[in-house]
Every structure is written in C-alpha cells, then in structure tokens.
Amino acid sequence: MVDKDNAITEGQNAERLLKDPLLIKSYEVIQNDIFQQWIRTEMEESDKRESLYFSLRGVLTAQNVLVNTVENGKIVENELRGGK
C-alpha cells in the first residue's frame, strides 16, 4: 500500500509541477533557446545541430517523465477507488 500511496503522491506532485507557471516558462525558454540556436547553425555544423537535438530530447524526456508520473498516479488512485 505504501508504494501505491507513494505513486499517488508523486503523481500529484508531478501534476503540480507541470502546472507551475515558472516551470512552464522555463521549459518554453529552454526549448525556444535550443530551437533558435539550431536555426542559426551553418550548413556544415551538423555536429552542433545533433548536439542541440539531443539537448531538446533531454528536455522533452524530462517533461514526459512528469507526465507519465501523473498518469501512473491517476491510474493507481482510480484502482484504489475501485475503478477500472
């Protein structure tokens, strides 16, 4: 039960983070900065573009971890309430 309670709590915390205006703005600024750097690269700077791509993937992965944590918490909470 502790693991399920923990999953619910983590899900609620992740949801709070995803709704936090500062975190939302931070993700937007980081993603925009990466994109702006990417579009300013020269044709021969493929290594730089690749590095920027992986940076963006890292940011998106962090967001996805939070989204998945929210969803997992909701699933566990629904199960405990007798839902399907």
List the predicted regions and their residue ranges.
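N-terminal acidic leader/helix
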Residues: 2-40, 76
